[in-house]
Amino acid sequence: MGDVEKGKKIFVQKCAQCHTVEKGGKHKTGPNLHGLFGRKTGQAPGFSYTDANKNKGITWGEATLMEYLENPKKYIPGTKMIFAGIKKSAERADLIAYLKKATKE
């Protein structure tokens, strides 16, 4: 399990420009991530997803996020997420630990 505080810093630096995490948060360039864990790809209400995201058909969890966040465009070819990914697995684990906490508060 990763470090929530380190994960928050990673989120602020690499994700917050396009995503929010709080309940009722606005969609930005990317969708609000509240309720992410256990949700299928391309399903945040009110966000316009690519067909690639809608049709991927996986459920977000620690394992799927670990793989996706390493290289989003490889995991979901055709996604409009322009983020290159996080190569270090420890940093991905920290980010996932933060997301797990922040997206259900």
Swiss-Prot record:
According to its UniProt entry, the protein's GO biological process terms are: apoptotic process
The record's listing under SUPFAM superfamilies reads: Cytochrome c
Coiled coil (residue ranges): none
Recorded GO cellular component terms are: cytosol; mitochondrial intermembrane space
- Modification type N-acetylglycine: residues: G2
Tell me the residues on which Phosphotyrosine occurs: Y49, Y98
Task: Give the similarity note.
Answer: Belongs to the cytochrome c family.
Function field: Electron carrier protein. The oxidized form of the cytochrome c heme group can accept an electron from the heme group of the cytochrome c1 subunit of cytochrome reductase. Cytochrome c then transfers this electron to the cytochrome oxidase complex, the final protein carrier in the mitochondrial electron-transport chain. Plays a role in apoptosis. Suppression of the anti-apoptotic members or activation of the pro-apoptotic members of the Bcl-2 family leads to altered mitochondrial membrane permeability resulting in release of cytochrome c into the cytosol. Binding of cytochrome c to Apaf-1 triggers the activation of caspase-9, which then accelerates apoptosis by activating other caspases.
Q: What is this protein called?
A: Cytochrome c
Q: Which organism is it from?
A: Miniopterus schreibersii
Q: Give the gene symbol.
A: CYCS
